[in-house]
Amino acid sequence: SFTSYQQAREVIDTTGGEYYAEMLANKGITYLGSFHNGFRQLTNSKHAVTTPEDLKGLKIRVPGSAVYMGVFKALGASPTAMSWSEVFTAIQQGTIDGQENGCSVTKSAKMDEIQDYMTIWNYSYENDLFVANTKVWENLEDNTKELLQQCATESCEWGRDRLEAEEDELIKGFQEEGMQVDILTEDQLQAFKEAVAGVTAELKQSYGEEACAAFGIN
């Protein structure tokens, strides 16, 4: 994953965006831009997580995705696929120890009220795409396409800026509420990257070298 929103912007606005455009064009879709959905962070009720060893044995709710399951298994945790609607109660009852999600979702779901520890590690970046049906797009006047492309670009930038500012405020709020928030350093993150190297290798095989190279996955 990217290490920062700045890196995400730089990659997606160059090689990543080019890859999206080519891939979508083959499906009759025109790519107009990309905006953040956010980095996924970790919260739990047990203890601070700053090393892979800290995750060992922790029961963490993840979406039902082989990638997420693989990452947490590689880190020694016990990933649990569970409906999001069940997570709050499961944490209260001790069925699971924590969850991973974006800061805004963590706040809206009131996880900060039942979780004492948060790890900012940017382990997974998610974004949404601004697209158009190519058949419809090609029937538009050139000046209309230019205007819509400009609006799409401006909207994506606005969305990115807003999410980044909102997350900074949310993290400050979590800390002020008494939540321990550990923002991992590059050295700390390196240990996690090494622990999931096998999963990264599998992703390269699954998605192909071209896709991985486009998004800076080496």
Write out the residue ranges for each language-model feature.
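N-terminal secretory/targeting leader peptides
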Residues: 1-7, 16, 24-218
